[in-house]
Amino acid sequence: MPQKGNPSPNKQPATPKNMNLHVNHRSYALPRQPVVVVCVDGCEPDYLGQAVANGHMPWMKGVLAEGTGLVADCVVPTFTNPNNLSIVTGAPPSVHGICGNFLYDSASGTEVMMNDPKWLRAPTLLAALADAGKKVAVVTAKDKLRLLLGHQLKGGICFSAEKADQTQQAVHGIEGVLEKVARPLPSVYSADLSEFVFASGLWLMRHHRPDVMYLSTTDYIQHKHAPGTPGANAFYAMMDHYLGQLDALGCVIALTADHGMNAKVGMDGRPQVIYLQDWFDCQWGAGRCRVILPITDPYVVHHGALGSFATVYLPEDVSPQQACDRLMQDQGVEVALTRQEAAARFELPADRIGDIVVVSERFTVLGSSEARHDLSGLDAPLRSHGGISEQKVPLIVNRPTPGLDTRRRWRNFDAFDLALNWAQ
């Protein structure tokens, strides 16, 4: 998606002199018009390409012609929590600390979800904007992100579509969301969950007009439907409809994704899985190594807790380099790295990953033990994410950005930079 328009040498990006906000070693201009940043969960760029080409996204077609369209890299592991937090902090996991949906807490010796703000090591831009006196609203599809995205958000609105029936003024900054949006509570396993996010965002912009709004969807559709299929095109047509209405209200819109999505099956259509816990048990004895799958969250029906990234804790007598060398001999493994190598390559907090990191190839996922994964909920060929093969994501702004260096490596966590510093 190349950038359209004629870059002007007279256009200058915002500089520290006219910026009012400094967060995580980056500077931002304060919003002068409503800014909406959208994270479309699982949005492989081809979803947009197919939907636009087949006439399902007229608004997006116009934006790509007149605005800014880039392909960026998200962070690895290509999962929801680390990338959403990268977007709202403007920084990689090595700065904000959220390295997965799930981790092994070595201090307590337990495996835990990374939903608690205690794991966050950096302030969010959303909280900083609220502290600067700006009206901030956050709507996320799944409630697992709400506390992280809303951390230290003073006076703002922050709720999830999943639990929109439980909103309270004192907790979420708003109440009676179902009545206000005039939609029923959606199922967490449906496209309706994401549509509720967009409908809520549109209602908030019409009735509260926040200065900055962050919308984060769910990838239920992307896990089930490939780009260009009727199910996928219907989802993106719905999204296009809401984004067009937000645009008509005068919003600067920056759209990106937390990760892409790929089929993870063999030619027979069956899931192509490397069960790492079984592999390590066979190599070095049962239970001596601990495999952690950072994709793990409460919503496993559509992916079976199978993703393309894993981290492994080894006993002292097992050399990390030896383990990596053996893994690299296995078909389906793209890369196996020691802790130090993985932290440097993927910008991860070294103290929150195992002794080694394993990333599988595009059509392969990583599991723990075969007996621990229930794939009975899969009613379509497995599609998932987590690896390097899901790193490419769209980065789109509904405004031209003359002077922008489109040749540099852009990241999904540059979304607020583009919206606040270039598009206004």
Describe each region flagged by the PLM:
Residues 42-46, 65-71, 79-83, 101-114, ...:
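Glycine-/proline-rich flexible loop or hinge segments
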Residues 360-421:
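Low-complexity, glycine/alanine/valine/leucine- and proline-rich hydrophobic stretches
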Residues 14-68:
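Active-site-proximal N-terminal segment of extracellular/periplasmic enzymes that hydrolyze or transfer
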Residues 32-49, 63, 87, 129, ...:
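Beta-strand elements within well-structured catalytic alpha/beta cores of enzymes
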Residues 33, 40, 78-79, 102-116, ...:
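Secreted, luminal/periplasmic, and some membrane-associated catalytic domains
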Residues 42-45, 77-78, 93, 142-146, ...:
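Short, solvent-exposed loop/turn segments at secondary-structure junctions
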